Design a protein with these regions (language model features):
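Amphipathic, well-ordered alpha-helical segments in soluble domains
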Residues: 11-15, 41, 79
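Hydrophobic alpha-helical packing segments in soluble, helical-rich domains
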Residues: 31-49
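Short, charged, amphipathic alpha-helical segments
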Residues: 29-36, 97, 101
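Short, surface-exposed loop/turn segments at secondary-structure junctions
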Residues: 25-29, 52-53
């Protein structure tokens, strides 16, 4: 890994670890937020090597935009969709999900050297 990619990996997985702690404490909402932030870090790094993509500045906008990008594998787009589904008044999405697993899937895809086209 390049030093900057190493840093992105460390920061993204720090968010996943924070999410695991939140989930362990029963706070699945915070776990989802941490997963999205970790994804945002990885996607932001990837976007540096894909300047043609205009996916916005926030993790939510990046996750939303990637859902419609057919050049991204369906399993990654599906994981992004699950992470951006709105919760109901009980803070539930109505689908079975593991936001941390979805986050890890997205992070691994966007930090995989084969997907980076590093300049």
């Amino acid at each position: 890994m390049t030093p900057i990619r190493d840093l992105a990996h460390i920061k993204a997985y720090a968010e996943i670890r924070a999410g695991q702690e939140a989930k362990k404490n029963g706070n699945i909402g915070k776990a989802r937020v941490c997963a999205r932030r970790g994804c945002g870090i990885a996607i932001e790094y990837w976007l540096q090597n894909h300047p043609e993509k205009d996916w916005g500045e926030s993790a939510i906008s990046m996750l939303t935009k990637l859902q419609g990008d057919q050049s991204i594998p369906k399993n990654i787009r599906d994981a992004a969709e699950r992470l951006t589904i709105k919760v109901d008044q009980n803070f539930e999405t109505g689908i079975e999900e593991d936001p941390l697993r979805d986050g890890e899937t997205i992070i691994e895809y966007f930090l995989n050297k084969n997907n980076l086209n590093e300049m």
